Regions:
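Carbohydrate-active enzymes and regulators
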Residues: 1-278
């Protein structure tokens, strides 16, 4: 039996757990060495290899309107053969674009921070490649530019920076991912639904049960035992989420979209690149 104050503390712990899970969804298993080339020109394909030079960890560029291109080759090792691999650049920049074997492949946005990283921070690299197969990986990052404000006395304090640390190759921890998204939804149910609603009661009971099952100290826990507990806790959440409305309930649908704030945020050349990233 939990009283209200104790339940609120428990809910805060579960929100903190959600944040910890977010940072563990992708597990680094390898790295790829990169070389670098910088330009202010609008380049619409991967530059020639001869333009690139060494790129040291910790290097920074502080310049408005700058594009940093990073280039590297990655050979699938035996230990990762046949697996689905992701690329996680530890590169600070306004926006970035991924090219694989000279083809546009994904984007990165660190301009808006969600938890520790941007909205798009870890992209799919390949599925099921055999050991020994090689990929050419290129990353184009943009430092951004000054955008005129709508207020007469507005001044820009933006720092136009690109900072390179390293580039990780990752695998997805499916158990952690499933647990994270289910916990995120049930946490929202407990926060948003009225206390008089039965559905909120179901969500609260599930969260309290998760609190009893899970080990919060992920780093010190035995990995195998922790994942077993996570699966057990996730099963409790999935039971709540499997309870759907009846056929006569209202319907809610989701529609995704992308839009371009052209004309006033970017010049035409950067808008073309922006469309490609999107």
């Amino acid at each position: 039996m939990y009283e209200e104050t104790q339940m609120e503390k428990t809910f805060r712990k579960l929100k903190r757990l959600e944040e910890m899970l977010h940072d563990r969804m992708f597990v680094p298993v390898d790295q790829v060495e990169m070389s670098v080339w910088t330009t202010k020109k609008l380049v619409h394909e991967v530059p020639e290899r001869g333009l690139f030079g060494p790129c040291e960890r910790g290097r920074k560029w502080l310049e408005e309107g700058l594009y940093c291109w990073f280039l590297g080759d990655y050979t699938i090792p035996e230990k990762l053969a046949g697996q689905t691999l992701f690329i996680f650049p530890k590169i600070k920049g306004y926006e970035g674009m991924l090219w694989v074997d000279k083809k546009p492949y994904g984007n990165f946005t660190s301009k808006v921070i969600q938890n520790s990283y941007g909205y798009h921070y870890c992209d799919l690299l390949t599925k099921g490649k055999a050991a020994g197969e090689q990929l050419e990986i290129a990353l184009e990052y943009y430092s951004h530019h000054y955008v005129r404000g709508t207020q007469p006395f507005e001044e820009s304090d933006e720092v136009f920076e690109i900072a390179y640390d390293h580039v990780d190759i990752c695998v997805k921890d499916e158990i952690v991912c499933n647990f994270f998204y289910d916990l995120h939804i049930v946490n929202q149910m407990a926060e948003s639904l009225s206390k008089e609603q039965f559905r909120r009661g179901d969500a609260v009971r599930a969260l309290l049960r998760v609190h009893e099952i899970i080990d919060y100290d992920i780093d010190l826990a035995d990995p195998v035992e922790w994942h077993e507990k996570a699966q057990k806790a996730d099963a409790v959440l999935q039971e709540v989420l499997s309870d759907h409305n009846g056929p006569h309930a209202g319907f809610a649908g989701l529609i995704g979209h992308s839009h371009m704030d052209t004309a006033w945020l970017w010049h035409v050349g950067e808008t073309i690149k922006k469309c490609a990233r999107t």
